[in-house]
């Protein structure tokens, strides 16, 4: 018989999941005076690819920004690689792709310079060795931007900016890759390139947490979906399947205005 919570000495916290790369427990967070996360539990284990889904304003981006420390928790616990957040220092193990931003943040830079910035945490005193340069080149190749390495990022399209941001995260050879809306506003060709790059990471055992609006070409890679609604987890399991008219090509999303008390519309992804 599995041990029950009552078997633990009174007052002892639950044991940590030793396979967890990310572990949020009872996490709450606010943006200004507005509560956004309302006591969510989220565990991402070694080697998993987890999609974080939900309507706009459900708390998806706030959740991932809490994981990397950009939004502080107001209550609850966070551990990374088994280490409580306040003691975690090994940020080189984490690659992060932010939501909807330009590759250089308005600073003049070449594609290679931006991607190289993602490698600096792995270097000594910021000096690139041969292995570092090889990692940068490999990251550029993975996203199909090696031939644009010397170009200014100001000359790139939106989809190419997104490729560069992903290459920057990959250049550090992370153990955990967190991507916030990596497919947003990206053309189909770029989506396929990014899916291919992600497949390579999954094959080498990288743990991945994705915020998505549409599964698209990433669907075969997803192990688990966690759906948020109003800052609460309402689903944690296999990705919802498309049904009815929503399964038709070109309708790979969910309308978030369904009655909250009704069975959620299940499509390619709950957005």
Kindly label every feature range from the protein language model.
Residues 152-156:
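Conserved ABC ATPase signature
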Residues 218-220:
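A short, surface-exposed alpha-helical micro-motif characterized by mixed small hydrophobic
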Residues 173:
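Conserved catalytic motifs of ABC-family nucleotide-binding domains
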Residues 116, 130-148:
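Conserved ABC ATPase "signature" region
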Residues 212-213:
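H-loop/switch region of ABC-family ATPase nucleotide-binding domains
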Residues 177-181:
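Catalytic Walker B motif of ABC-type/P-loop ATPase nucleotide-binding domains
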């Amino acid at each position: 018989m599995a041990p029950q919570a009552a078997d633990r000495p009174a007052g002892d916290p639950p044991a940590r999941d030793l396979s967890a790369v990310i572990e949020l427990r009872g996490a709450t967070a606010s943006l200004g005076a507005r509560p956004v996360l309302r006591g969510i539990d989220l565990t991402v284990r070694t080697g998993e690819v987890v999609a974080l889904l939900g309507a706009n304003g459900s708390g998806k981006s706030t959740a991932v920004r809490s994981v990397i420390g950009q939004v502080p928790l107001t209550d609850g616990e966070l551990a990374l690689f088994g280490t409580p957040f306040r003691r975690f220092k090994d940020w080189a193990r984490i690659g992060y792709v932010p939501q909807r931003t330009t590759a250089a943040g308005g600073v003049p830079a070449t594609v290679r310079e931006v991607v190289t910035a993602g490698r600096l945490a792995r270097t000594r005193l910021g000096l690139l060795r041969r292995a570092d340069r090889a990692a940068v080149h490999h990251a550029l190749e993975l996203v199909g931007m090696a031939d644009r390495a010397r170009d200014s990022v100001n000359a790139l399209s939106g989809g190419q900016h997104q490729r560069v941001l992903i290459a920057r995260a990959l250049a550090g050879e992370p153990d955990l890759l967190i991507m916030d809306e990596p497919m947003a506003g990206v053309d189909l060709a770029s989506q396929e390139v990014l899916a291919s790059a992600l497949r390579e990471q999954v094959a080498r055992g990288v743990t991945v947490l994705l915020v998505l609006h549409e599964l698209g070409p990433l669907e075969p890679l997803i192990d688990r979906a966690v759906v948020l609604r109003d800052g609460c987890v309402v689903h944690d399991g296999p990705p919802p399947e498309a049904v009815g008219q929503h399964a038709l090509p070109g309708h790979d999303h969910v309308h978030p205005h369904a009655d909250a008390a009704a069975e959620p519309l299940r499509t390619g992804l709950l957005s």
